[in-house]
Amino acid sequence: MTEIKLRIYEFKIFDKVKEFHAEIQAYSKSYSYSDEGPEESVVLNKDGLDGYKLISTFQLGYSDLFEYEFDFFIKYLNEDFTSEKYHLFRNNCRHYAFNLIRILKPTRGYIGVKILQDLNDMSEVLGKLIRGFLLVVIIFSVGLCFLPEVYKDYLLILVLILLYKQ
C-alpha cells in the first residue's frame, strides 16, 4: 500500500492571472503534466520552484495498486498526455491528476476528484472569458476600421450582445 497525496500550487500567467497546478504523489515520486509533457520526479515539493507556490496538500488515503501495475497504466495514460496535446484549459495538469486518481483509487479519492473538478470548472470559465474578450476586441477593431459611420452603432450593440452571452 502506498500513500496518495494531491498537491495544489498557484502560479501566475503573464504575471497577472492566477492559475493552479496539480500533481499527485505516490510511490515516493511526484507525477505531473505540463506543456513539456508528463513528468515523474523524486522532487516531492515544487514550492518556490519556477514561480510555484504551494497552496495545499491533501491526503487522499492509500492505494492497493502495486507500483508495477501503476507503471503499466501510466504508460498508456501518457499517450493521451503528450506535450503536443497540452492545453492550458482543456488538457492540463489537473486533468492528468484526475486520471491518476481514477487509476490509483485511493481510499479518500473522492476528495481529490471534487477539488480537481472545481479547479477545472474555474479554469474553463476563465478560458471562455479570455476567448470572448479577444473575439470582441477583434470584431470591434475590424469594425471601426472598415465599417461606414452609419453601422458603427450597430457594431457596438453586437459587441454588447456578445459580451452578455459570454
Regions found by a protein language model. Name each.
Residues 127-166:
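C-terminal single-pass membrane-anchor helix
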